[in-house]
Structure formats: C-alpha cells, structure tokens
C-alpha cells in the first residue's frame, strides 16, 4: 500500500529537487566505492602480502554487513526513523573509508570492510525506501540505480589515475571519506521530516505473520531469486577481477586496464538508461530482452577469450556491462506479476537478500580460482555462471506460463 504524500513530498518527486539529487549522489558514491575497490586489489595484495584467496575475504565481510542490514532494516527504520537510519549509514560508510585510509593491520582492514558493507546496505536500503514512496517512483528508481553505474564508471578511472601518479592506494579511501561528508550533511538537513517511523507497511506485516512463509512456498520466487543470485555473481566478479585479469593474464598497463574496467561500468550504466526503452519501442518484451542480454554476455566473453587484443577486451567488456545493465531492475519490476499482490513486497525483499549472497560468494570463488589456477579462469568461470543464470531465467518464464496464460511484458 502506497503512503499518501503531502504536497511537499509530492514536490520532492521532481527530478531536480535537492533530496532527489542527494539520493542520486548517494548511489553514485556507493558505485564509486565499488568501482574503485577492484582496481585497488593488487595494491592491497602487495602491501599486506596476501594472496587472491585471502583478498576474497573482503567480499565476504562486506556482503555480511550488507546482508545484516537487509534483514534488520525494517526494525532499524521503525526505531530510528528514516533520517536516523540514513545518518547511521553515512557514519558507517565514513568509518569504513577512514579505516582503510589509515592502513591498519589486515584484521582491522576486514573490520573496515564490514563497516563499509553495513554503511552501503543502509544507504541503499534507506534511499530505496524513500524514493519508492514518491510519485513517479518507477522512473526515479531506474535513474537512482543508473547513478550507481555512473559512480562505478568513474571509480576505476579515479583509482587507477591515483595509482599511476603514485599517490598511494589509501588516498582513494580518503577521497571517498571526504565525499561521505556532504552526503552525511545532506541526510541531516534534508530529511528532517523523516524522523517518524515509516507508516503502514510494517504494521500490515505484523498482522500477517505468515507473509514471508507464504512467499517461500512459491517456486517462481525461488527461481527468480536464484537467477539474481547468479546475475549479481557475474556482475560483481567481472567488476572486481577484470582489472587483475588484464594486468596478470593480458599484461596490460595499469592505466589502460583501469579505463577498460570503467568501460564495463559505462556499458552497465548505459544499458540501464536505454535498453528497456529501446526494447519497448521495438515491441520486445522484457523477458525476451533478458534472453537477448544473456546471449550477448556469453558471446562477448567468448570473443574476449579467443581474441587477445586490447581493443577486443575494451569493446567486449563494455558490451557485457551494457547487456547486464537492465537485468536486475527488470527482474525486480517483473516480480509483482509473478506473485499475489499481498506478498509482492516480501518477495522483492527476499530476492534482494538472496542476491547479496551472490555478491559475497561468487567474487570470493573467482579469487580462489585465480589463486589456484590463474586469473585466466575469470572468463570460463563467468561463462559458466551465465549459462546457469540462463537456465534459471528460462525456468522463471516457463513457471509463469504455467501459472497464467497472460504474457510477461
């Protein structure tokens, strides 16, 4: 049930209102942090004298933090209000960046990464909650997630440039921490009316204690969740290990490798901005679009595997990002059509929670494979993940056809 908004809240739905611009900035900062982290992995490995398998622990602890916030966000928002919740997230984000910047022992680096994961989980969840309550929420949420891609596009360029200038890998985290400060100030000043607990949604759920149980009984929800599990594994594994792959396996220089990774995130961003609209004009259903995107990912990965040229790698990773871009938001958008209306919100929450496991598990496995067999394994590994994801998406579509004769669009 949507909250009835005041005139002031309706005005905040404007694309250029300060609070929406702050939300875009927050998501861009999350993307900037994620995009930069992959470029910094070799520097962390050298500085702390740890291998790729140990570095994979960074993904596990970060995702643990995100996962904890995904399951406790309702209670925290109810207790703190949305403003307090977002302020908490910005502070945790800042603490995590400061921890990395100080170059502490590796055990404390893991704690800093946990703080970053908690902070990212709060900022993403809180801003999604706010924007989803506004008019034009569908369009605004699409733009919101696209700005993550904008940040992820800039992140590798910033990080690789700083490394190229020999400013030290920790300088990247001081920059990120500095950017957290205006976000924190914005949450304090612009969310003053969001100190109350969120209405209706939690109260409704209290009266329907079996909502999550009912959600878990629906097979198509599990299939969609498993699709997103593997999708996130593909996206994050490539986003974080492509730079190391280009350095170690293709012997590219650091600056070019950073630009190629940025091209991957640029493709992801552009895919979210344009692919769905283009498909709609061409009367291609969202289901068919995802099939086509998955095939494009496999073709691009094979192309990079077989042709060892920098230009092919650059174009291939950009195409992969472009093809991956719309899959996550389209799956979330289709979910209410797959389940009864009463449990749609619960189903979406379950999908997001399961996808976080993919964010932790698959990049870690990529690191283990890179350490044991070499970074060349990244491409066949992601091809295998994409094939499995294709199978789960086929199952989602055909389970839906069994449930209803209506077409998924």
Regions found by a protein language model. Give the residues of each.
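Extracytoplasmic gate region of multi-pass secondary transporters
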Residues: 37-38, 219-262, 269-270
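Helix-loop-helix hairpin linking two adjacent transmembrane segments in secondary transporters
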Residues: 137, 143-195
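Cytoplasmic helix-loop-helix junction between adjacent transmembrane helices
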Residues: 112-149
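C-terminal transmembrane helical hairpin of 12-TM major facilitator-type secondary transporters
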Residues: 285-331
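Helix-to-loop junctions at the C-terminal end of transmembrane segments
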Residues: 69-81, 272-285, 370
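A late C-terminal transmembrane helix in Major Facilitator Superfamily
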Residues: 338-377, 381-382
């Amino acid at each position: 049930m949507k909250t009835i908004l005041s005139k002031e809240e309706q005005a905040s739905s404007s694309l250029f209102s300060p609070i929406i611009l702050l939300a875009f900035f927050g998501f861009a900062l999350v993307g900037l942090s994620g995009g930069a982290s992959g470029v910094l992995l070799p520097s962390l490995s050298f500085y702390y004298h740890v291998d790729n398998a140990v570095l994979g622990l960074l993904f596990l602890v970060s995702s643990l933090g995100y996962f904890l916030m995904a399951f406790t966000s309702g209670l925290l928002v109810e207790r703190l209000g949305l403003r307090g919740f977002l302020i908490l997230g910005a502070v945790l984000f800042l603490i995590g960046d400061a921890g990395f910047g100080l170059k502490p022992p590796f055990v404390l680096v893991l704690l800093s990464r946990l703080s970053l994961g908690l902070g990212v989980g709060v900022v993403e969840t809180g801003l999604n909650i706010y924007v989803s309550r506004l008019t034009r929420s569908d369009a605004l949420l699409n733009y919101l997630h696209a700005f993550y891609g904008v940040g992820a596009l800039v992140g590798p360029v910033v990080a690789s440039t700083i490394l190229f200038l020999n400013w030290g890998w920790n300088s990247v985290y001081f920059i990120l921490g500095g950017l957290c400060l205006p976000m924190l100030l914005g949450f304090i000043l612009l969310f003053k009316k969001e100190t109350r607990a969120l209405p209706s949604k939690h109260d409704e759920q209290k009266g329907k204690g079996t909502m999550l149980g009912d959600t878990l009984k629906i097979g198509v929800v599990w299939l969609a969740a498993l699709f997103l599990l593997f999708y996130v594994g593909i996206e994050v594994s490539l986003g974080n290990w492509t730079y190391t792959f280009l350095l170690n396996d293709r012997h590219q220089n650091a600056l070019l490798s950073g630009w190629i990774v940025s091209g991957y995130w640029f493709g992801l961003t552009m895919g979210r901005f344009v692919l769905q609209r283009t498909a709609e004009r061409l009367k291609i259903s969202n289901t068919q679009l995802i099939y086509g995107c998955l095939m494009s990912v496999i073709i691009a990965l094979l192309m990079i595997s077989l042709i060892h040229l920098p230009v092919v790698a650059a174009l291939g990773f950009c195409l992969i990002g472009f093809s991956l871009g719309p899959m996550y938001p389209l799956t979330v958008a289709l979910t209410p059509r797959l389940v009864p209306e009463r449990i749609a919100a619960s189903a979406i929450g379950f999908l997001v929670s399961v996808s976080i496991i993919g964010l932790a598990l698959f990049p870690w496995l990529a690191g283990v494979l890179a350490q044991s067999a070499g970074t060349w394994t990244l491409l066949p590994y992601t091809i295998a993940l994409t094939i499995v994801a294709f199978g789960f998406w086929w199952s989602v579509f055909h389970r839906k056809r069994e449930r209803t004769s209506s077409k998924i669009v």
